Amino acid sequence: MKFWGSVLALSFVVFLFLTGTLAQNVGSIVTSDLFDQMLKNRNDARCFAVRFYTYDAFIAAANSFPGFGTTGDDTARKKEIAAFFGQTSHETTGGTLSPDGPYAGGYCFLREGNQMGNGYYGRGPIQLTGQSNYDLAGKAIEQDLVNNPDLVATDATVSFKTAIWFWMTPQGNKPSCHDVITGRWTPSAADTSANRVPGYGVITNIINGGIECGKGQNARVEDRIGYYRRNVSIMNVAPGDNLDCYNQRNFAEV
């Protein structure tokens, strides 16, 4: 019985490995050097977030969310990381300050419009916005962000955790960004009717579709795609199809 028990246990581990569900450390995909390469100018002295977004804070936050950057095969994991940093680099911007081109300049800003005080304005990599999101994110990461929203701009690990929480969490009729980029989202009939198809473009729709999607070609969507293309090039993976949301209705329109 011990022999067969060992065989079954080993078989289960092999199954988890082959299906990409065996827990892995995000650091095996995102090394410190890769982090610095993707976010090359985040510590430019002209950036308001200089020295805030650290590699160690990212890894600590990432490893607290099972599945983030560890789902699927090597290509799938790299695409998720490229997409996450593509979207959040657009949110935190700074491309105009970069001598290496507009898509090497993300993670320059920390607070939306460099505001101060305890309002629920955009903060951190995903620019977490609105009391509801601060409440939900805070409960998920066990921090009181309703009464202390600026923790998202003063604690780098908390800041990354709020961004990854948003990335991993479906809300209403929106799938999670994680499920979209890892190929685990199947569009509903309503999604198909709204031209919301699997790909990076739907992630833009999830994050800011009401402003950016369904309006034809526009600079903001192009910027998000530019960051993503740079990241997948660095990681040597293909970007996939359906990168924009130019012709997608946003999720609020059902």
Curated annotation (Swiss-Prot):
Residues of the active site: E91
Molecular-function annotations in GO: endochitinase activity
Keyword annotations from UniProtKB, A to Z: Carbohydrate metabolism, Chitin degradation, Disulfide bond, Glycosidase, Hydrolase, Pathogenesis-related protein, Plant defense, Polysaccharide degradation, Secreted, Signal
Location(s), subcellular: Secreted
GO cellular component terms listed in the entry, alphabetical order: extracellular region
Chief place where the protein resides: secreted
EC number(s) stated in the UniProt entry for this protein: 3.2.1.14
Gene3D superfamilies membership: 1.10.530.10, Endochitinase, domain 2
Catalytic activity: Random endo-hydrolysis of N-acetyl-beta-D-glucosaminide (1->4)-beta-linkages in chitin and chitodextrins
InterPro entries: Glyco_hydro_19, Glyco_hydro_19_cat, Lysozyme-like_dom_sf
Cleavable signal peptide: 1-23
Keyword Aminoacyl-tRNA synthetase on entry: no
Domain of life of the native organism: Eukaryota
Xref: Pfam families: Glyco_hydro_19 (PF00182)
Paired cysteines (S-S): C213-C245
GO biological process: cell wall macromolecule catabolic process; chitin catabolic process; defense response to fungus; polysaccharide catabolic process
Family membership noted in the UniProt record: Belongs to the glycosyl hydrolase 19 family. Chitinase class II subfamily.
Main function: Defense against chitin-containing fungal pathogens.
Protein name: Acidic endochitinase
